[in-house]
Amino acid sequence: MLKYIYMHLSHKYNHILFTYNMRIYLIKRNHMLFTHMFTTYAYIM
């Protein structure tokens, strides 16, 4: 029973960590993309 609870908690924790890392990754990627688009746009103007 205790092992099951521990497994469940660790799984939940891993899931939270994974989503958090994905969010940071996406934000960083979007930021880079946005910066690239902005510089290109400024260059065209």
UniProtKB/Swiss-Prot annotation:
- Give the signal peptide range: none
Tell me the domain of life: Viruses
Q: Which GO terms describe its biological process?
A: symbiont-mediated perturbation of host cell cycle G0/G1 transition checkpoint; symbiont-mediated perturbation of host cell cycle progression; symbiont-mediated suppression of host gene expression
Q: Where in the cell? A: Host endoplasmic reticulum
Q: What is its main location?
A: host cell
- A GO term from the CC aspect: host cell endoplasmic reticulum
Q: Does the keyword Hydrolase apply?
A: no
* The entry's keywords: Eukaryotic host gene expression shutoff by virus, Eukaryotic host translation shutoff by virus, G0/G1 host cell cycle checkpoint dysregulation by virus, Host endoplasmic reticulum, Host gene expression shutoff by virus, Host-virus interaction, Modulation of host cell cycle by virus
Q: What does this protein do?
A: Inhibits host protein translation, probably through the EIF2AK2/EIF2S1 signaling pathway. Promotes cell retention in the G0/G1 phase.
**Family, per the entry?**
Belongs to the asfivirus E66L family.
Mind telling me what this protein is named? Host translation inhibitor E66L
